[in-house]
């Protein structure tokens, strides 16, 4: 009987020691601090100012402000959700200064 109890305790301790799906460095949830968009489940690491802390945030929805792309992996405005396009500044200056903002539009709907 003692051996069964010990085996059960060992099995429970192994089960609790196994890491969960939540990330520490990658696979971060929205609202968690990040240093690059590749760390976030949503693929968007956003900060509100140059000195602000960046956090994982959802991608921009239709008619929301967006960034075309970033050279640094951190956005002031997140890129659009899948199926939407960000119509805005696509110049190299906008990419370097991270001010290439636009609005998310459904490309299929705007052609009709």
Curated annotation (Swiss-Prot):
Question: Between which residues do disulfide bridges form?
Answer: 34-45, 40-56, 44-78, 66-86, 80-104
Residues of the propeptide: 18-22
Q: Which GO terms describe its cellular component?
A: extracellular region
**Protein location:** Secreted
Known tissue expression = Expressed by the pancreas.
Q: What does this protein do?
A: Colipase is a cofactor of pancreatic lipase. It allows the lipase to anchor itself to the lipid-water interface. Without colipase the enzyme is washed off by bile salts, which have an inhibitory effect on the lipase. Enterostatin has a biological activity as a satiety signal.
Q: Which proteins does it associate with, and in what oligomeric form?
A: Forms a 1:1 stoichiometric complex with pancreatic lipase.
Task: Give the UniProt family note.
Answer: Belongs to the colipase family.
What is the name of the protein in this document?
Answer: Colipase
Q: Taxonomic lineage of this organism?
A: Eukaryota, Metazoa, Chordata, Craniata, Vertebrata
